[in-house]
UniProtKB/Swiss-Prot annotation:
Organism: Halalkalibacterium halodurans (strain ATCC BAA-125 / DSM 18197 / FERM 7344 / JCM 9153 / C-125)
A Pfam family per the record: YbjQ_1
Name the record gives this protein: UPF0145 protein BH0643
Annotated family: Belongs to the UPF0145 family.
Taxon lineage: Bacteria, Bacillati, Bacillota, Bacilli, Bacillales
Family annotation (HAMAP family): UPF0145
Amino acid sequence: MMIVTTDRIDGYNVKAVKGYVKGSTVQTKHIGRDITAGLKGLVGGEIKGYSEMMDEARKLAIHRMAQDAEAKGANAVIGFRLQTSTVMANAAEIIAYGTAVEVEKE
């Protein structure tokens, strides 16, 4: 599955547009990460637990979007975007979205 942020893929023609696709996940913090975050807030620096959590969440959202695209018969996603929002205290949603297309080499 090719996933690009552009509206086209060099060397390929769009054969068919399959439609909007998305994948999302909601991740929450746990007490261990909150304690570490509190300590890092005092001394500064990266909060690795949160960075790892968000990286895993992005990968999962992208994977779910790719599954949605495959279910629609696509072999690529163009116009790919990621968005994050807070859905409640200590919980964030990551959504990956784009346009599913079927492409073929020129």
